[in-house]
């Protein structure tokens, strides 16, 4: 069975790719540049991960209209990228308004054209930053949208294998699957060495700490995030 991967180049999409590869899907990978600060590094990570898993069918999409819309510190350089707040319950400034719906719409279009019946995305609800478009209920609803908005014979289903995992579980699963974490990129701020202090870096570093493993990518600083 053929499956499309939404592959950002981050840790979650990497492990999702490893899971889909293990399950034997014929994989096609989509990467979206939406005007984010670290788009060049993320694109490099996408290509490296796709090379690692020998994924030859790829689509690199430009959706920089999301950057022009603004409203997120990931795309609007007038908004600072906030430091880590691992206990915060609010929606952070890094939230890109309705981003995942845009990504899914493009991925469903491509899936329909190339005959893919499954669509993988590395969304995480349990240990995410509180993004509303990373919740299971969102993907359940979007599967209904696909059912109503595509040809009856299309049969595309979104799969979210990480949705209920904690970040530390994702690291453990990735290690068990031999996922090349050194090719992934999570930092919101930097394309050189990861900053180590943005929310995404902090969640990643804490996950590796909880597993007793050193994250293989380079950091400007490596704070301890376990109390």
Curated annotation (Swiss-Prot):
Pathway: Purine metabolism; 7-cyano-7-deazaguanine biosynthesis. The keyword Cell inner membrane does not apply. InterPro entries: QueC (IPR018317), Rossmann-like_a/b/a_fold (IPR014729). Its EC number is 6.3.4.20. ATP binds at residues 7-17. GO terms for biological process: queuosine biosynthetic process. It is an enzyme of class 6 (ligase). Keywords: ATP-binding, Ligase, Metal-binding, Nucleotide-binding, Queuosine biosynthesis, Zinc. Disulfide bonds: none annotated. It holds the Pfam family QueC. Zn(2+) binds at residues 187, 195, 198, 201. Its cofactor is Zn(2+). Catalyzes the ATP-dependent conversion of 7-carboxy-7-deazaguanine (CDG) to 7-cyano-7-deazaguanine (preQ(0)). HAMAP family: QueC (MF_01633). This is 7-cyano-7-deazaguanine synthase. The gene is queC.
């Amino acid at each position: 069975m053929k499956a499309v991967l939404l592959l950002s180049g981050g840790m979650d999409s990497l492990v999702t790719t490893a899971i889909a590869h293990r399950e034997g899907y014929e994989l096609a990978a989509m990467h979206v540049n939406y005007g984010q600060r670290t788009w060049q590094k993320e694109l490099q990570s996408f290509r490296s991960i796709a090379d690692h898993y020998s994924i030859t069918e790829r689509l690199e999409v430009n959706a920089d209209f999301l950057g022009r819309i603004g409203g997120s510190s990931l795309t609007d350089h007038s908004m600072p990228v906030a430091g880590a707040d691992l206990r915060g319950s609010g929606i952070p400034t890094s939230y890109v308004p309705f981003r995942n719906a845009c990504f899914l719409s493009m991925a469903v279009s491509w899936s329909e054209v190339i005959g893919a019946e499954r669509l993988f995305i590395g969304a995480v609800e349990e240990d995410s930053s509180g993004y509303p478009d990373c919740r299971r209920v969102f993907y359940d609803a979007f599967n209904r949208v696909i059912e109503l908005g595509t040809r009856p014979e299309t049969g595309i289903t979104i799969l979210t294998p990480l949705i209920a995992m904690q970040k530390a579980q994702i690291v453990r699963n990735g290690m068990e699957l031999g996922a090349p974490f050194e090719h992934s990129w999570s930092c919101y701020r930097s394309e050189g060495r990861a900053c180590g202090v943005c929310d995404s870096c902090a969640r990643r570093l804490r996950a590796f700490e909880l597993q007793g493993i050193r994250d293989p990518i380079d950091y400007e600083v490596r704070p301890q995030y376990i109390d």
